[in-house]
């Protein structure tokens, strides 16, 4: 577990950010989505991102509960985060806690409730345009270039010799796979006969 001193000394970067307990839940979805779409990261809730003043989270239970629901209610699909509480002394000298939200890098593309896609770049959550979002889908394997329509293509663009070669490779591979299954069945039958002797 990190200490409060380590949190305060750490600069905001691609994998770390501080947020006030007063942050709007919809606004908190943005860095969660952005980190999940990038390398993952951690959010420290209860530390002002502008002044780095320790506000803490105690005494703000209603807002805290709203923020804890953000990964489920405002992220699509939901982001599976891990939360921990770090004891601290707030700026008024009272015992308090901050909330650390650990966000794993995801193999899926995540958006906020407005279907906007963000990615963490440096210490900012960058909103992706359509092309950047499509590229992220390809990078995460949720979309394949083979599925992309090529609107101006005609049958003349297809190299039938390559198609024929491909079909031969596929049919040979399928034949070999069927042959292996037949051989395995024969071996299993021989083994069963031998074990019954």
Enumerate the predicted regions with their spans.
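Conserved N-terminal catalytic/coupling substructures associated with nucleotide/phosphate chemistry
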Residues: 1-197
